[in-house]
Amino acid sequence: MSAVFNNATLSGLVQASTYSQTLQNVAHYQPQLNFMEKYWAAWYSYMNNDVLATGLMFFLLHEFMYFFRCLPWFIIDQIPYFRRWKLQPTKIPSAKEQLYCLKSVLLSHFLVEAIPIWTFHPMCEKLGITVEVPFPSLKTMALEIGLFFVLEDTWHYWAHRLFHYGVFYKYIHKQHHRYAAPFGLSAEYAHPAETLSLGFGTVGMPILYVMYTGKLHLFTLCVWITLRLFQAVDSHSGYDFPWSLNKIMPFWAGAEHHDLHHHYFIGNYASSFRWWDYCLDTESGPEAKASREERMKKRAENNAQKKTN
């Protein structure tokens, strides 16, 4: 029996042989639930197996949201009008490159990412990640997701930076740098070891959070993973528009930040924000290099002046 309702009698009342009938029953017995909560409760009640319900939902969510976000960038790449905002306008991915990348990404999704996704619910039960309705408040979810963005960005910066050293780059991260001019679909084109290690930032940070607080809702995780997927695809899109988020939030990394990383193969290691690269002087690109050289020049002049005095 599903744990979506903390009431065995209610769980029995809403169950039906079809999903649509289950949804009607949920709406009848729980009219106070909002639109999403009713569909959520009906899904878990209809499946009547939380392990299967969570596994299937997470897998389909990941596939749909990833390719749903990749599709607009694929279309934009075919329209010359948008080249004015392309960061590397002479490097448009060919159909052959897109197809090769698609095959590799699908292989990764089904052979690498599917196993942890399908075995995730038992861990949820042990950690206290709940599927019950109603959902947490919007304020609670927003604060938690904001924290996850900050924590994931921190993990990503240090893990990504490690992947640019020696054997880690040669045998693992080099695969992701096959494309010096990234495109949306290439966001998850990576070695399995990189997929799992960098993916820990997305899933592992919420796990650490719930281990500390003892409370987290699975719907919050769904929203977080969706936003993280959108961020990853957008940062690999290769386009920087006047309305891009980094124009509104200067500390947001965006496509321009990550495109420089792929172009120069070094620096700009963070995923969502710019502060780690700024504070640790790992910003990439001509402007960052010029600024770094200017600071070094001034430092040398100051040291020379001190010695003279």
Swiss-Prot record:
Domain commentary: The histidine box domains may contain the active site and/or be involved in metal ion binding.
Cofactor (UniProt): Fe cation
Secretion signal, residue range per the UniProt entry: none
Protein name as it appears in the record: C-4 methylsterol oxidase ERG25
Family membership: Belongs to the sterol desaturase family.
Gene: ERG25
Subcellular location, record wording: Endoplasmic reticulum membrane
Motif, Histidine box-3: chain positions: 257-263
Subunit structure: Heterotetramer of ERG25, ERG26, ERG27 and ERG28. ERG28 acts as a scaffold to tether ERG27 and other 4,4-demethylation-related enzymes, forming a demethylation enzyme complex, in the endoplasmic reticulum. Interacts with ERG27 and ERG28.
Motif (Histidine box-1): 160-164
